[in-house]
């Protein structure tokens, strides 16, 4: 009879020095400041961290393997559950990869609606980051104010797609719906009001002595470290590298709108906070321009391509060919040509990209997601060394990770 061998958990094999002067502690995975099921194994010399090892996998759901057993359209709602704070960013990155694989060009109005959803989603993600980061450091008032404004933006998103968190708002070839009546007017009301709220946040934090003591020269990331560890988004721009995929490799209509790329050179937590605050304003600038672009677009919101995209509901109900084509797409899935593609996008947390390998069937042969939080979490191994235990939670909150896209 074969006796099964019990595999030791990998963290039991970590060669931490067992000395009287050192102490090993576990932060998480059940910890309110871990921002999810993250476990950090820390070796301390007094109050100073001398070794750190992130231990992930507590939320692993096998999403990439699940994709291989789903038709392409079926996987869209699953992407919501990666970075569940920015579901539309996940929806878009995946749809853009499939569209590139199929050679689909989406209608102009669909591109504008996608940009509106992405920038609203960026604002909600940044607001949640600021709220929880401030709460970790002790600024309770900012937490409450951020959630107040976030509710207004979530109402706008809910008015479009019916959901506040898991949007499933995009379709391969475009979007599911046109904007509701008076939607742009309500959005512009928010765009006019929100700058005053941002000023309130900055009045509370910018020159707050405790805030600056907890963020200045804390969690410093050099240019070299940011590049070596694959950092993207604000983690990269906060260290002096002015890189934004929306500018470097424009997608949708980002090449037709004017916006800046905020960056800082100090590389510490305070510098990243200032970059985030400026990004709010750039998103508002983009939203105002999208409202103008929308008015001059034709009404089509889905690409016309019977092989990959279903016809309109009216055609499906009245035309036999459209009904049959719709039936085949839903039961067998769209079938892109053989090949592989990688599409990078600028999510609120950094570079989010999907690699898809197609074998010509209705299901991807291989799907791989490149999520920013995964790379930033790995960086804790170097970033936390030399810091004090009291600053670990502040640094984790400042880096802005979400465990849903780390574990997948």
From Swiss-Prot:
EC number in record: 7.1.1.-
Pfam families: Complex1_49kDa
Catalytically driven reaction(s): a quinone + NADH + 5 H(+)(in) = a quinol + NAD(+) + 4 H(+)(out)
GO MF entry, a single one: NADH:ubiquinone reductase (non-electrogenic) activity
Superkingdom of this protein's organism: Bacteria
Gene3D superfamilies tied to this protein: Cytochrome-c3 Hydrogenase, chain B (1.10.645.10)
InterPro entries named among the record's database cross-references: NADH_Q_OxRdtase_suD, NDH1_su_D/H, NiFe-Hase_large
Main location: membrane
Keywords: Cell inner membrane, Cell membrane, Membrane, NAD, Quinone, Translocase, Transport, Ubiquinone
UniProt enzyme class: translocase
GO CC annotation, single: plasma membrane
Subcellular localization(s) per the UniProt record: Cell inner membrane
Quaternary structure annotation from Swiss-Prot or TrEMBL: NDH-1 is composed of 14 different subunits. Subunits NuoB, C, D, E, F, and G constitute the peripheral sector of the complex.
PANTHER family the record matches: NADH DEHYDROGENASE [UBIQUINONE] IRON-SULFUR PROTEIN 2, MITOCHONDRIAL, NADH-UBIQUINONE OXIDOREDUCTASE 49 KDA SUBUNIT
Primary role: NDH-1 shuttles electrons from NADH, via FMN and iron-sulfur (Fe-S) centers, to quinones in the respiratory chain. The immediate electron acceptor for the enzyme in this species is believed to be ubiquinone. Couples the redox reaction to proton translocation (for every two electrons transferred, four hydrogen ions are translocated across the cytoplasmic membrane), and thus conserves the redox energy in a proton gradient.
Designated name of the protein: NADH-quinone oxidoreductase subunit D
Gene: nuoD
